[in-house]
Structure formats: structure tokens, C-alpha cells
Amino acid sequence: MFQDNPLLAQLKQQIHDSKEQVEGVVKSTDKAYGFLECDKKTYFIAPPSMKKVMHGDKIKATIEKQGDKEQAEPEALIEPMLTRFIAKVRFNKDKKLQVLVDHPSINQPIGAQQAKSVKEELQEGDWVVANLKTHPLRDDRFFYATINQFICRADDELAPWWVTLARHEQSRYPVQGAEHYEMLDQKTRENLTALHFVTIDSESTMDMDDALYIEPIAQNSTQTGWKLVVAIADPTAYIALDSQIEQEAKQRCFTNYLPGFNIPMLPRELSDELCSLIANETRPALVCYIETDLAGNITAKPHFVSAYVQSKAKLAYNKVSDYLEQADNAWQPETPETAQQIHWLHQFTKARIQWHKTHSLLFKEKPDYAFVLAENGKVQEIKAEYRRIANQIVEEAMIIANICAAQFLHEQAKTGIFNTHSGFDKKFLENAHHFLMANLANEQNQTELAERYSVENLATLNGYCQMRHDIEPIESDYLELRLRRYLTFAEFKSELAPHFGLGLEGYATWTSPIRKYSDMVNHRLIKAVLAKQPYEKTQNDVLARLQEARRQNRLVERDIADWLYCRYLAPKVAENVEFNAEVQDVMRGGLRVQLLENGASMFIPASTLHNNKEEMQVNSDEIALYIKGERTYKIGDIVKVKLTEVKEATRSIVGEILQ
């Protein structure tokens, strides 16, 4: 009788329409219920309704009220958490194929089918790529997925690499090379093979793309400065613009440096052989002559030439550093000419470091963390590697060469790929001003600092550098780390703009064309100017792809490292090991710290810091945790921690602070 009653249907619709409707993101818990997080409020989702949604789904919901209790009833899917995703294969008790999503907050198995293109016979625990095909809120059917790609077996020791590369849709293979390579640049090159160029790299480096030569400039038998000659490998001599290799490099943008091995941007026979500046082999190069005074100031316009060069020695960072630091039983240069080059480069570098202190910015010394791996990918140890003097020699030569390239491209080509950074995000300039005043101002300097750290001043390169020089001598990293959150991201641009992070008016990299596509583009522009050939302005799609590829590569490196840290630290839980750590972030849920010995990221749950949640407050302006009204922990603090748990499935390392 009531079945098709239009009045009843209308009444139901009116009741439904009168209910509050909200949009939000689903958050699951380790129980059957969940929550809907909306802009201003969080609503409970009951267990039966949670079966229709997944953690991370953006949905529309109606709010059901029972007395003073409210709960969200999912209505429609706005954006699913899952489209393409990484998963592990499982078979249920009826031997039906399912997938387990590789995500710390999603633990429900999803029914799946294997695409015909996937030929492997799937086994329990295999890693795969899947796509979500049906969703209960969208398709009126249960969750269901298709497996589109096999990644590797469950017991593959290299799973951290293969799974992470698949997650970020990056190839694990080098670019396919050509059958043979011909020199396309038949233009005249200067013969600079007589100059005593040297390369300085890691012992294991195969893709040497920079070589250095230096000599003093003298007037009336008195040294007045330096002439530095920077030779950079020239892969564009072999790569046609319309070639498949060019298209691949344009897509990859960078060589991917991963723990244990790299995946080159160019075919290995180019990156490691034909273009690499191997000792005693003649190679095509783009060369820049740079002149400075003894204080490191550039005194002449840079002079670029196409040339042939021949490195006379392949030197290693650690050996050169040991030699210059006069370590016991240190390596010695093989020839007096090489020794002379090392000493001159050392003197030049000291002058340039001093120049930075006055005219631009130097970075605070932080180590790189290197994984030492066995053949099978097992982590044997993790080394903290500090930048030593030989690293600084190469770094300073590359920085000055890139300053010169920016100047040349800006003046001669009016375009290029420039590395830029505009300092504080405009929307955070006020915050940065107030933070600096709160931490550095007192009664005596209040007026002076109000001017010095005014919003207008902090927005200029000079004002920003002045502020950085002010905080440089301060022992703690607190100011540095807090201010970092107010900064904008570095960007690639096609026109000259300052790089606040380096403290420079302009910066354009061209010194790593084997490893960076942006440097290949700048090579072509410099060579076109030299040859008086036409060229085009750098396209926005190239800049956008560079930006995205840089972000992807950093995520790949971080994700693999997180996984390897878990494998390395898991056996140490039973040993109750202790570490010194730096607080990196402060959240409601706890602290994120970095272990100083090996670089691993550890989570400290708030429940281990204090037993009364009501007495804990996070101050998001200071990035600090207050307990009973006292500031107890802040970003940059050094704390002693104990390792308590490692969960490899979610790549999480948990610890507690030792009071």
C-alpha cells in the first residue's frame, strides 16, 4: 500500500533534505568505526557505514542526530583515496584473489582480478600495482580492483627499490641506447687537451661531468688573482633534438641516485663512457674561463668555448681531503702538476668561502647519510658523511660556474633555465617579522631590528641575507628550522631571478648535463649563442616537468631510505639502543625526531611524553610542545631517545625520550 506512495516518497525526501549535509575526508581508526573530518568539526562514522568508505576518501554525508549525539552517514563519493595504488597479493580462505593496500591506515582486503597483460602466476605476498574499479558509494558495488602490473616477489631483497619506483611511476631501467653514436657537433672546437684538468669525485663515480684547471693571474711578477677553467662534458654533441634519447631525458629530467645504485638519465654508454671525462681520454666539452681577484670577486665577463679536453687525473674526494689535511699515511698525488693543481684549487676555494660569508650565504654543516649495502641489498651500516675540503673545492667551482652561466644566458640569450628562490612566502612575511622580533629584539635594539627585519626589508635579497648572517652565529638550529617553514619553494624559471637560498642575484646550472636535463637545455642555449644560431625561449611545460620530476625523485629517495632504516633498525629493538636526536616537528600526536647518528626519522608518541593529555598543548607558531604551561620541547632541540618499535609494514620507527 505504501510501496509506491508519492506522498510518502516526497515526505522522505523532505526529511532527507532538511538534514545537515557536509563534505569531508574519512579517517579510519584501528577499530571498526571511523570519523569524517570537515573544515570546522569532526563527526563519528558507525562501523556499518565505514564498510562503504575507505580512509582518505573525500565524501558528502548527511548528519544524523540522536539526542545530543551526531554521526555522519556517507551519501556520495567526491574523490576516492585510491585510484592507482601499490598492494600485496593475498588469497582468502576460499583461495579468492585479494589485494592489501600498502598504506598505514588502510587494512581492509579488496577483492581483485588479474589483468590479462599480467603474465606472472601470482603468489601470496607478491608486490603489484592495482587500480580501483568499483567503490560502494559510487558504483553500488563492493570495493573491487584490477591488478595491472607485477612488481616483484615477496622475498625479493630489492623490493624497497622496485616497489618505490613503481609507486612513483619511475622506470627501474636505464634509457635504451642507440646502436652507434656520431658526433653531431662538427663545428670547430678549441684543442685544450694540453691543460692539466683534473676530476674530483667519489671513488665509485663513473659519470664524471666536470673537470677543473686553475692558474694564478700575475702582474709584474705579483699574483693578483685566479683564472679558473671549468670543463663540462658535452652530451648534446651526440644527442639530436628529435631523438628518442632526448625525449626520454626530457621525461626523466634527472639521474636518480638511490641507495646502492643509480638509474641514469642518459644511456650508460653515454653517461659512463662516451661523455664521461675519463682520465687520459679526449672528450668534447663546453668550457668556461672565469677570472677572479685574490678575494674571490669575479673580475671579468665569463668566456665560454666549445673544446676538446683531456682529464689528466681521476681524483677521489676522501683522498684529496686527507692529502690537504695532512692525515697520517695520506694518499699522495702521482705527479707534481696534479699536486700543484690541488694546492691552487685549495687556495681559490678558501677565498671563495670567505667571499660567500660577506656577499652571499653559506649552508650550516649537515652530514649526508650513506647506506653501505651488501650484494643482496642488505644494509650493513649507515655512515654520516660530512662535506670535507675536496667536496668544497668542487662545490665552489660549480657555484661560480653557475653564477657565470646565469649572467651569460641573461645577457646573451635573454632566456635559459634559471634556478630561483624568492625567500619567504609572501603570506608568511608578517609571521617571519614577528618571530624574529620575539626571539632577537630587546629594549636596546628594538628600533634598529624593527627596521632591519621589516616586512619590506625581508622581501629583498639584501635584507634576507642580512637576517641570515645575523642568525648564523647562534648555536641552536631553532631559528633556522622555524624560519624554514615560512619559506617558499625553489622554482625553475625561464628568466633571471634571485636565489635567496644561495644569496645570489642569479643562478643557472649547466655543470651536470649528464645528470640533469635543465643543464642540457642550458648547454644548447650557450652553444647556440656561441655559434650565432637561432634558439627558442624555454617552454613552460619543460619547467613544470623539471619541478615535478625533482619532487618525485626526492620522494623516491626518501621512501626507499625509510624502508631501509626499518630493516636496519628492526634487529636493534631488542638491544635497547639509545641515540641523540634532533626534534624535527611537533604535532598533537607526538614528536618527529631525526637520529643524528644515521639520519633515520623516529616518531615519539605524545602518550609517552606525559600521562595527562589535557595538560599538553602544541604551539604551532613556535612549533613547540607545552606541558603544564611550560615549553618542554621545540623544533631543533637535541634529545636522547630509545628505540622501542619498528613496523616494516608501515615503514615506521617508534621510540621514547629518555628523561
From Swiss-Prot:
Compartments (UniProt record): Cytoplasm
GO cellular component: cytosol
SMART domains: CSP, RNB, S1
Protein family according to the UniProt entry: Belongs to the RNR ribonuclease family. RNase II subfamily.
Protein name, UniProt field: Exoribonuclease 2
GO BP term, example: mRNA catabolic process
One Pfam entry name: S1
Keyword annotations from UniProtKB, A to Z: Cytoplasm, Exonuclease, Hydrolase, Nuclease, RNA-binding
GO molecular function, one term: RNA binding
Job of this protein: Involved in mRNA degradation. Hydrolyzes single-stranded polyribonucleotides processively in the 3' to 5' direction.
Domain S1 motif residues, every copy: 576-658
Recorded catalytic activity of this chain's protein: Exonucleolytic cleavage in the 3'- to 5'-direction to yield nucleoside 5'-phosphates
Enzyme Commission no: 3.1.13.1
RNB domain location: 189-531
HAMAP family hit by this protein: RNase_II
